[in-house]
Every structure is written in structure tokens, then in C-alpha cells.
UniProtKB/Swiss-Prot annotation:
Cellular location(s): Mitochondrion
Remaining remarks: A stretch of 270 kb of the mitochondrial genome is duplicated within the centromere of chromosome 2 resulting in the duplication of the gene. The expression of this duplicated gene is not demonstrated.
Keyword presence, Mitochondrion: yes
Regions of compositional bias (Polar residues) in chain numbering: 87-99
Domain of life: Eukaryota
Keyword terms, alphabetized: Mitochondrion
Region Disordered, annotated ranges: 33-64, 87-106
Comp. bias (Basic and acidic residues): 52-63
Zinc-finger in keyword set: no
One Gene Ontology term, aspect cellular component: mitochondrion
Name of this protein: Uncharacterized mitochondrial protein AtMg00890
Length: 106
């Protein structure tokens, strides 16, 4: 009975950890799919005869992906600062974390 409980708690913990990463992966995949279909639609309408049109298109698709990558990095940093790097925030509030203090003293 006790063994089943511990396995169950481990499963729920791993699900909680994996949930945000899977959500980011899905949103990123949806976004890349949207941009790819959008860019092919532009190519069909323009016919892509001139080189200027091609350059403009590549810049537009690059600008579409920029905010997503920035948002992704912000989400990862906010999640990691809450979970893994709590010792760094503890250092600011007066607590001490051995690995960080060693790196600073050197």
C-alpha cells in the first residue's frame, strides 16, 4: 500500500514538471505551422518573380518568429527562477547558497 502511494506521488510530480514544457512545445509548433502556411500563401499570391519580394518575405517571417522566441525565453526564465534557482533569490533576501557564494568569492 505504501509503495503504491510513493509511485503515484512520483508520477504526479513528474507530470507537474513536464506540463509547462509540453505546453510551450505545442504553442511553438502551432506558431511555426501558422507562419509556414502564411508564407506559402504569400508566395502563391505574389508568384515570387522578383528578388525584392523574396527578401521582404523572409524578413517578415523572421519578424514573426522574434517575439515568440523572446516570450519563450521569458517563460523558461520565470519558471526556472521559481523552481530550480530558488537559491539565487534566497541569496538576495539574506539567505546563503554554497555554489553561488563559492563562485562569487573566487
Amino acid at each position: 500500500m505504501h509503495l503504491e502511494r510513493s509511485v503515484q506521488s512520483q508520477l504526479t510530480e513528474s507530470k507537474e514538471i513536464a506540463r509547462p514544457y509540453s505546453l510551450w512545445g505545442i504553442s511553438l509548433a502551432q506558431h511555426s505551422f501558422k507562419t509556414s502556411t502564411r508564407s506559402t500563401g504569400k508566395k502563391r499570391s505574389k508568384g515570387s518573380t522578383s528578388q525584392d519580394g523574396k527578401k521582404q518575405e523572409s524578413l517578415e517571417s523572421r519578424n514573426d518568429l522574434g517575439p515568440t522566441i523572446v516570450g519563450l525565453i521569458r517563460k523558461i526564465l520565470s519558471y526556472s527562477s521559481k523552481k530550480e534557482f530558488s537559491n539565487l533569490t534566497g541569496l538576495e533576501s539574506g539567505g546563503s547558497s554554497p555554489p553561488f557564494s563559492l563562485a562569487v568569492s573566487k
